[in-house]
A protein has these predicted regions:
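A residue-level marker of the well-folded mature domains of exported/periplasmic proteins
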Residues: 1-202
Length: 202
């Protein structure tokens, strides 16, 4: 059994969101209210509140991993509710598209964050970053262990930032350098073993 500790990268995206918001409201399009997703939203919240204690996180659940029309409707509702950071835990880039259109068409100061893959091309002007997986490193480690005879069954592998299993997607072109530097410095601190694997929950 193996998995990536996505909450680590979510915490970092939360810091970026907390630094970027002007309304102190982050809107999340949630896939399913299951433990993994709730944990990730909690990590986002903790990251944002670590730099901005006035943060409020609002979630609309669409009960789907991929449903672009529902995703779009939820993102628009969150935007109308005063959330100026749109975040998603689904596999659709709809929140990125909504943020881009709201800024270009209506001049709204709204930003977006992606999920699981680089989504910035879907709305480059208003994209911050997002959490993404690097499964190739996990598979390489397992294959190497089999090849060298060191693979062991019946174990649980939890891999995170230090093992490059989770990461941040490329920063958006309009994200202030101060925000990027702050988040990257905290990430480096994590990689240097100054935080344990279960931070911020430990």
């Amino acid at each position: 059994n193996y998995g990536c500790m996505s909450y680590q990268a979510r915490f970092l995206t939360g810091i970026a969101a907390g630094l970027m918001t002007k309304t102190n409201r982050i809107g999340v399009v949630g896939s399913y209210p299951i433990p993994e997703i709730v944990r990730n939203i909690n990590a986002l919240t903790l990251g944002a509140q670590s730099v901005n204690p006035n943060i409020e996180v609002n979630v609309i659940w669409i009960n789907s991993w991929f449903d672009p029309p529902k995703d779009m409707d939820a993102a628009k509702a969150l935007l109308d509710g005063g959330n100026d950071i749109l975040y998603t835990t689904t596999d659709s880039p709809s929140v990125v598209v909504v943020a881009q259109k709201a800024w270009k068409r209506d001049g709204k100061e709204v930003w977006s964050m992606g999920n699981d893959a680089p989504m910035g091309l879907n709305g480059p002007d208003r994209y911050i970053t997002g959490m993404m997986f690097h499964w190739s490193g996990v598979y390489k480690q397992l294959v190497d262990e089999v090849a060298t005879g060191t693979w062991k069954p019946n174990r649980r592998m939890n891999l995170g930032l230090k093992q490059n299993c989770v990461a941040l997607s490329p920063w958006g072109i309009n994200v202030p350098g101060k925000v990027v530097n702050t988040v990257e410095t905290i990430k480096t601190t994590w990689l240097d073993d100054e935080y344990d694997d279960f931070y911020p929950f430990s």
